[in-house]
Amino acid sequence: MDKFTTLEGVAAPLKIINVDTDMIIPKQYLKTIKRTGLGKGLFSEQRYNDDGSENPDFILNKPAYRGAKILVAGDNFGCGSSREHAPWALLDFGIRCVISTSFGDIFYNNCFKNGVLPIRVEQADLDRLFDDAERGSNATVTIDLPNQEIRGPDGGTVKFEIDPFRKHCLINGLDDIGLTLEKKASIDSYEAKAKTERAWA
C-alpha cells in the first residue's frame, strides 16, 4: 500500500447525498478480485450514457476534474452494501481522499485498509470546500495528514480528526499484511522460544 503523507491536487465537488456503494461501483464490476482496472467502473452509470458515450454533465467527465485526486461529497457517502471494490475503484481512478460530513461505516473502514483517506468535517466546512472545489483546475486543495488539516487554495485551513492507529498505518503504507510483517521479528522470536521451551510439541 502506498504511503499517504501530503496530497495536493484538484478536488471534485460531488453534491449528492446518500451515494451508496452500488453507485460508486455497480454490481457488474464485482466479479473480479483484482484491485486494478476498476477505475473505468467508478460511477459508470453516471459517467456514461446508455450508448457508452460519456455524459458531459457528470463532474468527473468535465475537463477540470478528470485528474481529480480528492472528492468532496455529500452526506452519508459510501452507504449501502459492503463491497471493498468501492475504495479500489476510487483508488484506481486516482482519488486518494474523500471528504464528507459522514460515511457508511463499512465503506469508511474499507477505505483505510486500502490507502484511501476518508475525512469527516462539519457541514459549514464542507460548504467552504465545495466552494473551493467548484473553482476547478484553477484551485488546488492540500491534504496534510501528519498535521491533520485541509488547506484550501486561499490558505484557509480545516482541521480534522483521525484515529491515531489508522493515521500511523496510512503514513507508513501499512495494510493488514504490512502490519503483520511489521511484527515479523517479534513473531520469529516467539516461535523460536516456543520451539525451545516445548520441543516435545
Swiss-Prot record:
Question: Which InterPro entries does UniProt cross-reference here?
Answer: 3-IsopropMal_deHydase_ssu, Aconitase/3IPM_dehydase_swvl, AconitaseA/IPMdHydase_ssu_swvl, IPMI_Swivel, LeuD
CDD domains, alphabetized: IPMI_Swivel (cd01577)
Catalyzed reactions per annotation: (2R,3S)-3-isopropylmalate = (2S)-2-isopropylmalate
What Enzyme Commission number(s) appear in the record?
A: 4.2.1.33
An annotated GO cellular component? 3-isopropylmalate dehydratase complex
Molecular functions (GO terms): 3-isopropylmalate dehydratase activity
What are its GO biological-process terms? L-leucine biosynthetic process
| Keyword tags | Amino-acid biosynthesis, Branched-chain amino acid biosynthesis, Leucine biosynthesis, Lyase
Instruction: Kindly tell me the pathway this chain contributes to.
Output: Amino-acid biosynthesis; L-leucine biosynthesis; L-leucine from 3-methyl-2-oxobutanoate: step 2/4
As for what it does, the entry says: Catalyzes the isomerization between 2-isopropylmalate and 3-isopropylmalate, via the formation of 2-isopropylmaleate.
Q: Which family does it belong to?
A: Belongs to the LeuD family. LeuD type 1 subfamily.
Quaternary structure note = Heterodimer of LeuC and LeuD.
**Could you tell me what this protein is called?**
3-isopropylmalate dehydratase small subunit
- What organism does this protein naturally occur in? Rhodopseudomonas palustris (strain BisA53)
